[in-house]
Each structure stands twice: as C-alpha cells, then as structure tokens.
Amino acid sequence: MNNTTEYIDALPLTDIEKAALPKSDIRAVHTALDGEHHPFSRDDDTPLGSVKARLEQAWPDSLAEGQLIKDDEGRTQLQAMPKATRSSMFPDPWRTNPVGRFWDRLRGREVAPRYLSRLTKEQQASEQKWRTVGTIRRYTLLLLTLAQTVVATWYMKTILPYQGWALINPADMFGQDVWVSFMQLLPYILQSGILLLFAVLFCWVSAGFWTALMGFLQLLMGRDKYSISASTVGDEALNPEHRTALIMPICNEDVDRVFAGLRATWESVKATGNAAHFDVYILSDSYNPDICVAEQKAWMELIAEVQGEGQIFYRRRRRRVKRKSGNIDDFCRRWGNQYSYMVVLDADSVMTGECLTGLVRLMEANPNAGIIQSSPKASGMDTLYARCQQFATRVYGPLFTAGLHFWQLGESHYWGHNAIIRVQPFIEHCALAPLPGEGSFAGSILSHDFVEAALMRRAGWGVWIAYDLPGSYEELPPNLLDELKRDRRWCHGNLMNFRLFLVKGMHPVHRAVFLTGVMSYLSAPLWFMFLALSTALQVVHALTEPQYFLQPRQLFPVWPQWRPELAIALFASTMILLFLPKLLSIILIWCKGSKEYGGFCRVTLSLLLEVLFSVLLAPVRMLFHTVFVVSAFLGWEVVWNSPQRDDDSTPWSEAFKRHGSQMLLGLVWAAGMAWLDLRFLFWLAPIVFSLILSPFVSVISSRSTMGLRTKRWKLFLIPEEYSPPQVLVDTDKYLVLNRSRSLDDGFIHAVFNPSFNALATAMATARHRASQVLEIARDRHVEQALNETPEKLNRDRRLVLLSDPITMARLHYRVWSAPERYSSWVNYYSTIKLNPLAIKSK
C-alpha cells in the first residue's frame, strides 16, 4: 500500500475529506492541511504546519476559542494552563539547635507571635477558648497514658522470674571467672531490656486506646460543640471573590482511574450549581512517556465531555523538583494568587460537590483556619485484602479520627489530600527547605503533609479535621505488598520528619505528631526486640543451671519466682487495650444501625474475621517495618520492582521471594521453642504461625475472586457498597468507559499516529527560540533515535523527544516519508494495535 494513502486513512476524516487530500507524498498532505501556508525550509518540519488542522479533526469539542496559540517561533501551541501571575514562595532555613534558640531568648531576640492581631476580639476569644480546652484535654491524655503505663510496667516487673538481685552474690563476682559473672548478670540485663521496651510499647498502645475511647463517646453522643462543621448551616452562598482550585498532583498513575474519578468529582460540583467558583488543575510529574501521552489524550476527552474549557487545566513539569510538595509549590508560585483556597486531591481521590462546597463554607466561616482536613472513606476495591482493610477503616476509622479531633482541636493533622488549604498563608509560611546535612535523612522532605500542617500552625493558623463531613473518598492498596511499598516511603519520610522535633516555634501538638509518626514505624523494631529478648530470657532460663544456694551454710534455697495469675491478668489487660476499640466500633454500629454493613450477624462475623486477619498480618508488618527502619538508618536503598499484575494479585513467586525469609524465621523459631519449652511456644504461636503462613495469606488475600466472593456473602460490607453514592457510581461508570478507549504505547503512537502526534507536538513544553546549536542537538537526537530500534530507546531519551515540538514533528515525518530506511520503527509499529475507540473517527 502507498504509505501516503495509509497516512490519510489514519486521519479521523470522512471519506470525502480524505479523497480531497493529495496522495503524492507526505509533504503534500501536510501542506494541504496547513491552512496558514507556513514556509518551511525543511521538509521534515512541514508537520508543524498541520498541527492545528489535525487537532481540530480529532478533538473538535475540546478546543476553546483562543486555546490554540502561536509560540515565539510561530509554532502551534495548545494552551493547557492559564496565564501565570507569579508569587514569591521561599522557605526559611530550619533551626533545630535548642541551645542557640535558648540563647536568643536570653538576649531578647525571640519575637512573640502576632497572628491574633488579624482577628476580631470575638474571634480571639473563641480561639483562646478552644486552645485552653485543648491544652487541658492533652494533659489529661498524658496523665491517663502515663498512669496506665506505670501500673502495667509494675505488673510486668512482678511476673518476671528474676526478682531483685537475690540470685547474685556481688562479693563472689569479683573473684570468679568473667564468663560465669556474665551469665549470672545476663537474666537481669534481659529483664531490664524487656521492661523498658514493654513500657514504651504499652504507652503507645495506651494512647491509641484513649483516643478511640474519646472518639467513641463523641460519636455516641453525636454532639460536639468544638466541631468545625458546626460553624456553618451548610446552605450559605459562596463568596464569588473567593475562588477555589482543585489541584491533583499525579505521577505515573493509572490514567483511566485518575480521569474517571476527576470527571465524577467535577460533575458532582456542577450539580451543586457552584462550578463557577472552582477550577481544576491536573499537575503531572509523570516520567513514563507512554503515560504522559495517555494523560494528554484523557485531558482532551475530559474537557469535551464535561464542557470544561477554561476551567480544567493540565500541566506536566519537565523538572520534577521536590516531588509532590514541589509540584504543589510550583502551582502556588505561578497561579496561587488567583485563588483564595485550594483543595488537594490524590490520584485516587473522589469528592462530592456537597463536600467541596462544604469545605469552602467552613473556610469562609472560620477566617483563622489554614487547613481543614476531611475524613476520606476507603472504597472501590475488590481484592480480599483491600475489602478487609476497607471494612476496618470504615468501622474503626471514625473512632480514631473523632478521637484525634477531641485531643487536638485546631492543632490537628493534615494527610496531604482531600483537604482544603488557605492559599495565601500556605505561600507565606509552608515552603519546605531541604533538611541540612548529608545521608538518608537529609535533603528534600518526603512526608510533606505533617510538616506543612506544623508550619501552618506555627504561623498561627488553625489546622482542623472535619471528621463528620461526608462525601470524601479514597482507595486503598489492593494487596499487602503494594501497601508495604507505600509504607516504605512513609517510614522514611516520618523518620526524616523527626529531625524537626526541636525546630523553633513548632507547637507541642505537632512535635507530638512528629513523635507519633516515628512511633508508627519504630514500634515494629521495638516489638521485634521485645520478642527477641523474651525468647532469649526463656533460653537462658531453660538452659542455665539454677543456683539455689548462694551463701555458705545457707539453710533455705532461693527460688526464681513465677506468678502465672499476674501474667494472665496483664495479658488480658493488654488485649483489652488492643481490641476494645474494635468492640466499641461494633457497638456503635449496633446502636446506630447495622443494615448498611450487612446486618447484625454479618457485621459481627466480619469483625471477627478482620480481627483474625489483623492477627495474621501484624507479625508480617512488624518484620517488614523493622527492615524499613534499619535500612533507612543505614542508608540502604531498597529497590522493590514488582511484576505487572492484571488483577492486582500477588504471584506465588513474588510472595515466596518477599516472605520466604519470614517463613524460614517462623519455622526455626517455632522448632526451637518446641524443643526448648513447649509451653512458651503456646505464647508465641500467634507470632510464629503468622510468619509461617505469610506467603499463603499474602497470595490468597490479593485475589479479586476471594474478595468478590465475600462481597456476595455480604461480608466486609461497607455503606458505600450497600448504597453507593452517585459520585462513586459515576466513577465506576467512567472507569469502564475509559478502559474501553485506553491508549497503550502512547509514545510510539505519538510518533506515528497523525492525531496523537499533533497533540504531543502542540503540548510539548520545550519552546526554545531558533538556535543553530539547538538545531544540531535536535538532529542528533532524532538520528540517534531512528537508528536504534524503539525497544532500545530508553525512557529519558523518549522524554527529551516528547518535550520538543520540532523533534516530534521530524520523527513523525521521517518514519512516514522513508519507511524503508526506518524499517525497524515501522515494523515495530506494525506489531502494535491502536485501540479503535482511542480516538473518534467521522
């Protein structure tokens, strides 16, 4: 077939329009499509002239008037973002030296905060009231936690076998062999370590218990005078002068899911009648060229289908500085001063229009609120693991979120998404400086959300959780290994954040947030050390010959003490602290109605199964988190490349690769304890058998078939599955639609397909002036790329080509005009099938 005829057939035109085009050569086709008759000195630049026509043919409903502009060199450019109005946003250096700060205070250089001056007297009184209440509550929490820990630690001390120093004669230790002395001291050393670790871990569990208990009481009473949601009635008109940007930072995400959720969210906003108060910004940091092209296509389709011209924008950064926080900062610098508020969305976020307008109303009603965090509900996943986790977060999550609000009030958490932020103070106070020094805990901050909340509060602005505001949703990882990959990043980020514990001006609550963030992961190695020391103490106790007579002519032996009744009481108390929040959660559901959870029997059975599941997974997470903490401290780079999975299930090979060492540890541990003391194995059984079963649990729980089966049985049912809100129904509907027209191998199609090449060329960001040096570099890039097979063209080189409109035009022209010369590319493209629904044809 004539390659020119084949090219014309690829254009989304009617047969009559195709017949009108010249079929002599590719240059003639582009010249005919070039309505402005650009004079090009090079044949391979002629596709630049036809970009406008090819775009209008493929996406006529996506292009607003004036959206196709000319750059400084007269090339067609698709204006995907509004005109920038820059603001200055720069970080203050971190001051972590408390001695230097104390010296400044002695010299009178500390400046008292003056943020209350921007509030009216009534607002100042309200602010002071909740701050006083919050302080009293936190001291109460501290007292309850410490008192409980002291009592439990004392009980723990009484049940350990070696009481006091009665089994050691200090006078004999100086005259005997060093090894003998060490073996006499070893049980006491191990017991001291056990007691210390027990105290820390019990304190951590106790804090969670009291948080859940207060949350239970708040939700049971249903009345909270300090809830920020109570500050509005919910139907106030939005101030047209205060506009809101919905920003979604994305990086190599599932394009179909991202744009399905975003479309459902935007249509929900339009249904409220308040769409004029909002704009949407898709801020891409994607570096996979195929995904970059797919994002551009999905953006064009979204604009056409929701009539979002002039309100839905897309930008891909070429320089990915500071990851997600840098992406948000970049938005604030360029467009932030055009908006009063911004709502940060994750790639899997879905929010109703009522929730978004409600957040704006809360900002309007609370002029000293800097961040208001909604409480996102997990939904939308089908694997057994994800459904179990969805159920757990839906049932237990509200207690802990309400409890956090009870203790923290306006000095609360920010989780980085599904939250509204006041833009101006964010620009002024929340830029993040890199952490000084070298090593794994220096450089750009990874977990930016906690730090931004701390900086916002340091500047005097409130950070609230609207825990009772409905309509906010997110998705969870589909399987255990995907969750652990996410935990690895969060672990490193929280360990880095702890360096800010002593930074100047941080509120004590946010210092505690940094501490709890560290403990979320540091508790794993502490628990592992506790188990290891307990095992070592049992080994010493079993293998060491006891010395009952320590003094000459001693009449009565000194026995090691063991009080099993106290051990059982302490164990029962610890289990109550761990599992009572789960019981309170189910009681709350029983009281308020369990129909949406499958009914009384099914929700109760689901709870019991979830408890069993959490017991099986806790030791597995413990070992993984221990590895994450140790690797972070040692500066190890943990590379975790998982294979592609069609249904998000974990292959057996990967499961044994990731869990094999845990399984081996469990087998050795169980065998050793069975040989040493079968009674001690009974206490360790939940730990060792969970490790032995870890590969099997990981694989089985990752399967959608198991999850869908429990869904049919109405187990792990959540309200969003029983009666799905419209925004989630729409998300699923649009996801099916997007999957049916998805674009794979986007970069290759951007080189060959006329429509996708026009889109990539028009959205390319490297808009340089004419330069002989650049021309030489472009020719070199194009020649090097075409002289290799597409498979050998790495990601970075593809990105360089994709970012330059001229290189994309020249690649496009050459592969079509000289297919014999570039046969490796043409043959490769012939093996790739373009989804016929990926682009509309006339």
Swiss-Prot record:
Pathway assignment: Glycan metabolism; osmoregulated periplasmic glucan (OPG) biosynthesis
Organism: Enterobacter sp. (strain 638)
An example Gene Ontology biological process: glucan biosynthetic process
Keyword Electron transport: no
Localization, UniProt: Cell inner membrane
InterPro entries: Glucans_biosynth_gluTrFase_H (IPR023725), Glyco_trans_2-like (IPR001173), Glycosyltr_2/OpgH_subfam (IPR050321), Nucleotide-diphossugar_trans (IPR029044)
Cross-referenced PANTHER family: CELLULOSE SYNTHASE CATALYTIC SUBUNIT A [UDP-FORMING], GLUCANS BIOSYNTHESIS GLUCOSYLTRANSFERASE H
Membrane spanning stretches: 141-161, 194-214, 513-533, 570-590, 615-635, 680-700
Membrane topology, record value: Multi-pass membrane protein
Keyword Cell membrane: yes
A cellular component term, taken from the record's GO annotations: plasma membrane
Record keywords, A-Z: Cell inner membrane, Cell membrane, Glycosyltransferase, Membrane, Transferase, Transmembrane, Transmembrane helix
Top-level class of the enzyme under EC nomenclature: transferase
Protein name, entry field: Glucans biosynthesis glucosyltransferase H
Family from the record: Belongs to the glycosyltransferase 2 family. OpgH subfamily.
